[in-house]
Amino acid sequence: MVYDGPILDNHLHLNRRGLFLDAARDFQRQGGTDLVLVHLPDFSAPPETRAGHEAAYADTLSMAQSVREKFGLGVRVVLGPHPAAFVHQFERWVNEDGENGRDRAVENYRHSIDAALHFVHEGEAHAIGEVGRPHWPVADEVWDLSNELLEETMHLAAQEGIPLQLHVEGESADTYPDLSRRALRQGMDLRKLIRHYAPPDVRTSNTCGLIPSVLCGKGALDRLIETHEQAKHGFFLETDYMDDPRRPGAVLGPKTVPKRTHQLLEAGVSEEVMWNTHHELPAKVYGD
């Protein structure tokens, strides 16, 4: 079977100091046609002002345009405050200035969301993300505040029908149910809520209506094949490629989604399912 349809990586980062355009070239040469480029902050010095967030986002948008112009790939862009950047700023500023530091961190988070919304309204960005909560143990205060701000962001997204890409903790029995409850409480359409770095059990009974974006390492294939027919709305595939010169190929390399797509087809997953993954679902979630 020769599949010549679209192939989309739903969560990939690019870095001007990394492979950048060469990574996009590798993706295309393997058969990739579309990318969802997710903003990645400079964790060593994340923005501290609204203007700083806008400038950082503008650079991600510029990289997306370079990829479009150079290779003709479809590129959708996701902008927002990475939970790790928020948590590290929060902890540093609270240590420096107590309650004032807390307020400053919350204000900066809101500025980052406002800046992302600006580019969504301008038609340059397609979703907000990756937003959510830390994937490592933190103090209860940090966890509770992260959830509070996540729900605030869900509320804003619900008002305008904007998709969210979520960065959350590793799998636990309550992860999907908790996210679903919070989103529904804020009026979100769960079909606009994407769980980045999702495990490969994509049954709707497991995902509670969220859209899973499966990190498609080799170990994910068997479970994905077992469960994909029970994914009511479908699923995405992603690499979470970091384009980090210090960690080449992490998390998965840019050639991975095209390779996994063909492996899934060879294993008996239908072309219709892959067409939904790579074309119909992205159009429904992000728009054309």
Give the location of each predicted region.
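Mid-to-C-terminal alpha-helical segments outside catalytic/metal-binding sites
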Residues: 6, 155, 258-288
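Active-site gating loops and adjacent loop-to-helix segments of metal-dependent hydrolytic enzymes
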Residues: 31, 37-51, 87-102, 124, ...
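Metal-cofactor-binding active-site regions of metalloenzymes
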Residues: 2, 44-46, 50, 54-120
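Divalent metal-dependent hydrolysis catalytic cores, especially in the metallo-beta-lactamase
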Residues: 6-15, 22-55, 69-85, 126-127, ...
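Short acidic/histidine-rich active-site segments
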Residues: 167, 231-252
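Active-site beta-loop-alpha junctions enriched in small/polar residues
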Residues: 11-15, 40-42, 80-86, 133, ...
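Divalent metal-binding pocket/active-site signature
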Residues: 16, 106-200
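Acidic (Asp/Glu)-rich catalytic clusters
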Residues: 2, 24-31, 61-76, 113-125, ...
